[in-house]
């Protein structure tokens, strides 16, 4: 009986988080009340307070169910970039993986959209803002370490200070994803992301990566008539 009660409680918690995701995306965070979420989940407002302290606590729990693009990049480069065989390639791979997951995983895409386009940082949401800033700062600090390790490994001096380089890369990727979320059909997130990242890194002084040329159709040679 105890096991079933725990399972039911966990199912209710996930149901509330699922409902919150849907409503936050449709209405925005500030326009969605806890009662709205309870009704959408088919439960009571009291059930929400059993699992979450307030809307900010619920929001952070929703965020913790996915690994967002920034965190994907952070996790993909390890704790000690200087130990990596190829720090720059590890960074490229981590960014590519983050963009791929954003483009293909519906929940990741939905939560990132909510976190960047549907939330207003006021009142009880200040804790959410603090979490967002901490994630951003951690990502930029790690990116700076990777860029510096790559520059040291290749004997390069970056074109700009490493902190500025990390900030620029973060702003570019973050802005790229946000623009794609506004109109996913406007461009291919993964292909465009790969191109702009390689171009940006080349601008910092790293050797450029040869991009595959677009395929062109070969013209068929006209058949020659045999001479009589």
Q: What kind of region is each of these model predictions?
A:
Residues 1-27, 31-43, 56-60, 221, ...:
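Basic, helix-initiating cap at the start of DNA-binding domains
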Residues 71, 75, 85, 89-92, ...:
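Amphipathic alpha-helical packing segments from all-alpha helical-bundle domains
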Residues 90, 104-130:
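Amphipathic alpha-helical segments used for helix-helix packing
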Residues 52, 60-66, 73:
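Alpha-helical DNA-contacting segments of helix-turn-helix folds
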